[in-house]
């Protein structure tokens, strides 16, 4: 993609097939599903079955803390949802939108570990076309998917917006920013975020074109909740400059976490990642 000239990319985006289809091919890499959801005879209870590729790292006891179900989006797709009760006394629940090359099965162990360490429950979902979710991944479906997840989290579990932390990682920052720009929540965490699709492909892009996809840079200033941005300084996929640019546009930014030497897929392996999240959840949110 980076070998294309600016004019060639403009032609690619502006001519058939439509920009949304181009964006989908470039941004979404759904893996072969690493789990299945089996519904019981009543049609109300779903059982999670993980494949070996999910790399489950805990016992069956921890797995029992995971509740899964399906919900329908405004665009007609059925998406898989996962609620991980890490901490019964948790004040906050993370609405977690994952990266572009994983599904809920692969993320389930990470959710257990993260939630138990920062004292939060975690609600996540698979994008259309990922895991057990129907349909195909697209920018429009991303927004419909997170809307359906937001509604399910609030209605099924009775969790109020002021107790929800909207968390997006990589491509997951796109639906997260869109949702947070429309609804207030306890806070927003953006992990390795992008400013827009064009700016990822062409770092010198200074404005948002009509054919651009995923325009976080134009939406982030509408977020009224506190925003924590986390980015690796050596990110080889989404340059560190994207995190900086978004930080500068925030209405209510908190102290960001720039992880020295971290790339795109290893930020969470650095000790300061968990320390910053613990501080943010346990101390800073209380005073914001």
UniProtKB/Swiss-Prot annotation:
Palmitoylated on cysteine residues located in a cysteine cluster at the N-terminus which promotes membrane localization. It comes from the Eukaryota. GO terms for cellular component: dendritic spine; endosome membrane; plasma membrane; postsynaptic density membrane; recycling endosome membrane. The keyword Transcription does not apply. GO terms for molecular function: palmitoyl-(protein) hydrolase activity. It is a lipid-anchor. Its EC number is 3.1.2.22. It is found in: Cell membrane; Recycling endosome membrane; Cell projection, Dendritic spine; Postsynaptic density membrane. The keyword Ion transport does not apply. Keywords: Cell membrane, Cell projection, Endosome, Hydrolase, Lipoprotein, Membrane, Palmitate, Postsynaptic cell membrane, Synapse. Pfam families: Hydrolase_4 (PF12146). Belongs to the AB hydrolase superfamily. ABHD17 family. This is Alpha/beta hydrolase domain-containing protein 17B. It comes from Xenopus laevis (African clawed frog). The gene is abhd17b.
């Amino acid at each position: 993609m980076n070998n294309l000239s600016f004019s060639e990319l403009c032609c690619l985006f502006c001519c058939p097939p439509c920009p949304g289809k181009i964006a989908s091919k470039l941004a979404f890499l759904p893996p072969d599903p690493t789990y299945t959801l089996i519904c019981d005879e009543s049609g109300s209870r779903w059982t999670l079955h993980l494949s070996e590729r999910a790399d489950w790292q805990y016992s069956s006891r921890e797995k029992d803390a995971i509740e899964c179900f399906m919900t329908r989006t405004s665009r007609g797709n059925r998406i898989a949802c996962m609620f991980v009760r890490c901490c019964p006394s948790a004040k906050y629940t993370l609405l977690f939108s994952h990266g572009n090359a994983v599904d809920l099965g692969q993320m389930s162990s990470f959710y257990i570990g993260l939630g138990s360490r920062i004292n939060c429950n975690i609600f996540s979902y698979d994008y259309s076309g990922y895991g057990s979710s129907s349909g195909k991944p697209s920018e429009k479906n991303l927004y419909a998917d997170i809307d359906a997840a937001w509604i399910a989290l609030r209605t099924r579990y009775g969790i109020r917006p002021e107790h929800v932390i909207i968390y997006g990682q990589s491509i997951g920052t796109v639906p997260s920013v869109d949702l947070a720009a429309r609804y207030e929540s306890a806070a927003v965490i953006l992990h390795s975020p992008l400013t827009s699709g064009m700016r990822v492909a062409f770092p010198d892009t200074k404005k948002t074109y009509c054919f651009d996809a995923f325009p976080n840079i134009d939406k982030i200033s509408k977020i009224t909740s506190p925003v924590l941005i986390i980015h690796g300084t050596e990110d080889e996929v989404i340059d560190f400059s994207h995190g900086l640019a978004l930080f500068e546009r925030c209405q209510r930014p908190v102290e960001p976490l720039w992880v020295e030497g971290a790339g795109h897929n290893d930020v969470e392996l650095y000790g300061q990642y968990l320390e910053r999240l613990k501080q943010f959840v346990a101390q800073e949110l209380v005073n914001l």
